[in-house]
Amino acid sequence: LIFAGRLSKEKGIEILLETASQLPNNYHLLIAGSGPLEEKVRKLSDEKTNLHYLGYQSKQNMLSLIRGSDLLIQPSLEEGISSTLLEAMACGTCVLGSDIEGISEVIENNKTGLLVEPNNSDELLNKILYLLPKKEKRLSMANEGLERVKKYDWKIVGKLYLNFYESLLNKSI
C-alpha cells in the first residue's frame, strides 16, 4: 500500500492514519510526502511496525515506489484531476480513492479502481481488506486503468483542469 502526496487535511492524511492504525500487521503502508501533518505521520510510524514514513521523494523514486506497490490510496477530501492517480494508473498500479469530483472523473468504480466515501476510515479499511487478497481483481483494474490513462494526454488534461476551475468559479458566483 502506498500514499504519495502532501501530508495535509485536504489530502485525507488524517483518515488514512486512522485507517492505518487498524491495518493488520502483515499489510504495510508506505507514506511518501511532506506537509503540515508530517509530525503526526512520523509519530504513528514510530508506533506501528507496518507503517513506513519515507518523507519527500524525488519523482523518479516516487514512480518506482508506486510501480512496486499493490495499491495506491488517495483518500482526499478535495482534489482536482489528480496527477498522482494518473501516474499510478500509468505505472500499472491499482488505485483506491475518495468518491469526490476530480478523483471520480479518473477512477471508474470497480473497473479502473475503487471509490470510497470521503472521510470514512471504516469504509476505506474495508475496501483495502477486500481488495488486497484479490490479486486478479487488482491486476484487472490496473490494466483497465492503464488503458484509461492513455486518453489523458496533456491537451485533454488541460481541458479537464479548465472545466474544473470554471465549475468552481460558477459555484462561487
Predicted regions and their residues:
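A short, well-ordered alpha-helix in the C-terminal region of glycosyltransferases
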Residues: 123, 130, 137-151, 160-163, ...
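Short hydrophobic beta-strand element within catalytic cores of glycosyltransferases
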Residues: 94-97
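Aromatic "clamp/platform" in nucleotide-sugar-dependent glycosyltransferases that forms part
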Residues: 77
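A conserved mid-protein helix/loop that constitutes part of the nucleotide-sugar donor-binding site
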Residues: 3-22, 29, 36-39, 114, ...
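Nucleotide-activated donor-binding/catalytic signature segment of Leloir-type glycosyltransferases, i.e.
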Residues: 41-57
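Conserved acidic donor-binding segment of nucleotide-sugar-dependent glycosyltransferases
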Residues: 109-110, 114-121, 130-135
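Short alpha-helical donor nucleotide-sugar binding micro-motif in glycosyltransferases
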Residues: 56-57, 64-69
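Short acidic/histidine- and often glycine-rich active-site loop of Leloir-type glycosyltransferases
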Residues: 87, 100-110, 114-115
